[in-house]
Amino acid sequence: MKKNTIEKLSRNFGGSANREVRIITPDLIDEYITIYLNSYPAYKDLSDDGISGYKTKYINSMKNDENITFVGLFEDNNFIALMKIIDFSMNAFGKMQHSVGLMSLAVHPMHKKKGAALDMVRFFEAYAKETNAAVAMLLPFRIDFYRKMGYGYGSKLDEYRIPTVNLPKFDDISCIEIVY
């Protein structure tokens, strides 16, 4: 289903006309690693051994992690950006629901500030809608980028603390469960 959904949305997600999203497979690992390491160079091992380790890690993930889909943005057939889409189940209101997450969004340095990251997020939103995800989560790399798109730091949380002496008396505690 993931592959069909991604192919269906590949050009029809609201992105730029000459851009397409495709599933990334191990045959594109060199381009993938180039974009990934140049987008996030801090704290990365850029030695030959380090790069070889990244390649091994990501090829293994591409082949074996069924919940992770590696996708790339192509402009005029050139690989310019990447991200991972995570499909998982989440307990929402006591029921397991299909959910999705966006992770490791990276744009090749030569294509930054050209709307590629925005197109990737638009694709992710379209994917979440198309797969009827109950929850879509972002792993933000820059909060200000997502703020411009209307995302916030989190939803409003109201917390109330009520002393137990103010609760009504209840003798039957058989339905109460202690959670640790």
Model-based region annotation:
Residues 2-81, 85-87, 101, 168-180:
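Short amphipathic alpha-helix that is part of the acyltransferase structural core
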Residues 62-64, 93-95, 152:
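Short glycine-biased active-site loop of nucleotidyltransferases that positions the nucleotide triphosphate
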Residues 64-65, 74-79, 107-113, 129-133:
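Short, solvent-exposed loop/edge-beta patches enriched in aromatic
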Residues 89-102, 112:
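A conserved beta-turn-beta hairpin within the catalytic core of GNAT-like acetyltransferases
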Residues 104-107, 113-126:
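Conserved acetyl-CoA-binding loop-helix of GNAT-fold acetyltransferases
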Residues 130-134, 140-159:
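Conserved active-site alpha-helix within GNAT-family acetyltransferase domains
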Residues 43, 98, 115-116:
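Alpha-helical/coil-rich non-catalytic "connector" segments in signaling and regulatory proteins
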Residues 1-2, 87, 150-171:
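Active-site/acyl-donor-binding loops of N-acyltransferases
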